[in-house]
Amino acid sequence: MNGSQTLVVKLGTSVLTGGSLRLNRAHIVELVRQCAQQHAAGHRIVIVTSGAIAAGREHLGYPELPATIASKQLLAAVGQSRLIQLWEQLFSIYGIHVGQMLLTRADLEDRERFLNARDTMTALLDNRIVPVINENDAVATAEIKVGDNDNLSALAAILAGADKLLLLTDQQGLYTADPRNNPQAELIREVHGIDDALRAIAGDSVSGLGTGGMGTKLQAADVACRAGIDVVIAAGSKPGVVADVIEGKPVGTRFHALETPLENRKRWIFGAPPAGEITVDDGAVEAMMARGSSLLPKGIREVKGDFSRGEVIRIRNLTGRDLAHGVSRYNSDAMRMIAGHHSQEISEILGYEYGPVAVHRDDMIVS
């Protein structure tokens, strides 16, 4: 349809519960109404929803459970079916079908599984079905979790080939300071590039009860904008917020997409949750950042995590700053063995080699 857009709407726990311990159904009804209205106008809508644990706790009558991962997964297992049932019931009022997609990091860090997820998303949207996405909290451990639904929504936006990503929160947008304790705080209306100054402003400011504060929203915005997707952070309570974003009206904080977005494979590299990380010395930083070189084993100081060859890893400098994401040419065990050694020693150390570089420049995205 001419002029139709694909919009990903992310609803965090603070929006879905209104700050309480239970789902705020009246608020969810209103947001579904807004989304259904845009769906009827020909736009494609994707929902990224939190709230499975809150729904499970409510359904079980707020049981007293130990604060363990197993307890959270129990609540998520009970609540996820209740949550998707709620979305299904509300969208059915408007004759709209929904399709559930539960994802973990493993689905997104592997290129083939990423493409399969993208194909599923495309099929749902092509058939006018609203994908409802959540992290698979019932089975996800710390090692396989994306970690928060802000970053999950950025990945969903890439999967959907979205035009815009709307991050709904309990704040009006990103402020120059925390508006709850600083009366001088001003709303930042437009952002044309995310830099260290903006990251410092976001800091550890929180946006309610969920796992994602403004810092994670900024991370999500960075990923989506690099993929050519506009991002808006706005209050879920603002009347007509979904239509405002579709129509391009001023609302919340708008992050403008890069004019020259990353090509598809590099969107995956930058967006995929890193399976591990490596720390590199100053010489490697100079070679990568100033000369555009590949990362050689000689420059690696430390390897963290367990990852396979072909998985995306994070590259940091000695002070811990995030420099780049890249596809590892070697698994983590091999990387530890060849770290600090010259490339010509790889075959002797491992008994095999996949080339002289640890991460090739073509498989790397500088942060």
UniProtKB/Swiss-Prot annotation:
SUPFAM superfamilies: Carbamate kinase-like, PUA domain-like
Reactions accelerated catalytically: L-glutamate + ATP = L-glutamyl 5-phosphate + ADP
Binding site for substrate: 50, 137, 149
Localization, UniProt: Cytoplasm
Annotated control of activity: Proline-mediated feedback inhibition.
Mutagenesis or variant effect for residue 117 to V: In proline hyperproducing mutant; 700-X less sensitive to proline inhibition
Keyword RNA-binding: no
Pathway: Amino-acid biosynthesis; L-proline biosynthesis; L-glutamate 5-semialdehyde from L-glutamate: step 1/2
GO BP: L-proline biosynthetic process
Enzyme Commission code: 2.7.2.11
Main location: cytoplasm
Any Gene Ontology CC annotation: cytosol
Pfam families tied to this protein: AA_kinase, PUA
Domain PUA: 275-353
Alphabetically ordered keywords of this record: Amino-acid biosynthesis, ATP-binding, Cytoplasm, Kinase, Nucleotide-binding, Proline biosynthesis, Transferase
Domain of life where this protein originates: Bacteria
InterPro entries in the record: AceGlu_kinase-like_sf (IPR036393), Asp/Glu/Uridylate_kinase (IPR001048), G5K_ProB (IPR041739), Glu/AcGlu_kinase (IPR001057), Glu_5kinase (IPR011529), Glu_5kinase/COase_Synthase (IPR005715), Glutamate_5-kinase_CS (IPR019797), PUA (IPR002478)
One MF annotation (Gene Ontology) recorded for this entry: ATP binding
Residues the entry annotates as binding ATP: 10, 169-170, 211-217
Annotated HAMAP family: ProB
Function (record text): Catalyzes the transfer of a phosphate group to glutamate to form L-glutamate 5-phosphate.
Family: Belongs to the glutamate 5-kinase family.
Name assigned to this protein: Glutamate 5-kinase
Taxonomic source organism: Serratia marcescens
High-level lineage: Bacteria, Pseudomonadati, Pseudomonadota, Gammaproteobacteria, Enterobacterales
